């Protein structure tokens, strides 16, 4: 696969992570350590799922093609609902910061990478080329997630966004999850 095609695939796959990272970054309770772990998990699971898909390829393509969007969409909708609930309750404890939630989010934004592995990367003849391409996808996702956290830092300074960040982030995640499920 040529670099341009691989780069476009990597950017497309990382947009889920960008949206989720942006919403997480808008939350005032999120610290740098958590943001870093989210970005690392997002990148790692993009790589992992893409490489699994690339190696499993044609064997499961027929049966799993629609499930990733549904599962990922449901998880992201649930996170959106949790964010809105926290905004309404105005709690200091934040459920999206609970241990393991960053792993769940990392998996949910990366399931589609497995489908890409099934369809686009399974034709690559060499295991090293699959490893190279999937590492590239993971690294692009890592940097796109970091970009989202940097962007959210500046968006929080806008009073309306900072005040209603949980609602805005929750609504965006719900719409994003519904889009993943139905479109």
From Swiss-Prot:
Q: Report whether Cell division shows up as a keyword of the record.
A: no
Give TM segment ranges. 6-26, 40-60, 64-84, 101-121, 135-155, 158-178
Entry's localization field: Cell membrane
Protein name, UniProt field? Putative manganese efflux pump MntP
Give the way it sits in the membrane. Multi-pass membrane protein
- Its biological function? Probably functions as a manganese efflux pump.
Question: Gene name?
Answer: mntP
Family the entry assigns: Belongs to the MntP (TC 9.B.29) family.
Q: Which organism is it from?
A: Clostridium tetani (strain Massachusetts / E88)
Do the record's keywords include Membrane?
A: yes
Query: What is the first-listed, main subcellular location in coarse terms?
Result: membrane
Keywords attached to this entry? Cell membrane, Ion transport, Manganese, Membrane, Transmembrane, Transmembrane helix, Transport
């Amino acid at each position: 696969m040529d670099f341009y095609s691989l780069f476009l695939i990597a950017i497309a796959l990382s947009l889920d992570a960008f949206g989720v990272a942006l919403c997480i970054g808008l939350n005032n309770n999120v610290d740098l350590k958590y943001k870093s772990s989210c970005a690392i998990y997002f990148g790692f699971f993009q790589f992992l799922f893409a490489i699994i898909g690339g190696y499993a390829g044609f064997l499961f393509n027929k049966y799993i093609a629609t499930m990733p969007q549904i599962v990922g969409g449901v998880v992201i909708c649930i996170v959106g609902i949790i964010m809105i609930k926290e905004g309404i309750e105005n709690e200091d404890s934040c459920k999206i910061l609970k241990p393991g939630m960053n792993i769940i989010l990392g998996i949910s934004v990366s399931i589609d990478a497995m489908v890409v592995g099934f369809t686009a990367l399974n034709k690559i003849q060499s295991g090293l080329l699959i490893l190279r391409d999937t590492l590239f996808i993971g690294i692009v996702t890592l940097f796109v997630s970091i970009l989202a956290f940097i962007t959210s830092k500046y968006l929080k300074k806008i009073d309306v966004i900072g005040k209603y960040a949980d609602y805005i982030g929750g609504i965006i995640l719900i719409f994003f999850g519904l889009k993943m499920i139905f479109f």
